[in-house]
Amino acid sequence: MLDLPSSTPFGNLCLKYMKILQTMSYINEKLVLIFLEDINIRTNRSFINSSYLISIDEVVFLLRRITDEIIALLWLLSQWIKSGQCPTKLSIDCIGSALNNKEILSNYLLDYEKFLDDLNHISNAQKHSFINSDLNLIGYDEPVINALRLDRNNLKNFDIQNWEKNHYSISVRYLIKTFNALFNDMKMNIEHLNSQLKIDSKR
């Protein structure tokens, strides 16, 4: 467990980080069920259980939330070191704002820009796209995340002849593998920033 600042305007950062780890543990439990159900569907050629697709959506939602929280934590610590005091506003608090910030993108997230962009679009499509619920697709040979994007729910933004441009399809295995790499890198960055913050506070 990281010994992060326990008293900040945003609460106990150590507890926030612990909640992230607890959520990751829950995601792992859901993933086991998803892959077991996927095997059952293919082995027994059974109908797709609605809970199977909903569970995949839930994993995406939680991974998005964790990623947003890690980005916010990273930015908070970096700004604390830069200004000498804990910020009272999180200007960078999610994937979208991080992707639009050259500093945090180049310093911490550049290797994961494509992954973050995909996760951002997929989670937004699941949350906002009115046509996304029409999708009832599964992967050819493994669990796959599918999302159908419709910007602002305006059909003028959807070309039926080239619908693939609005369709996202990535394997759950790829999502988890890339997220794990991202999390490990972010954890090291947070550890480094936290150590620097402790050194600065003793001066």
Positions of PLM-derived features:
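Acidic, Ser/Thr/Gly/Pro-rich intrinsically disordered interaction regions
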Residues: 1-57, 61, 71-203
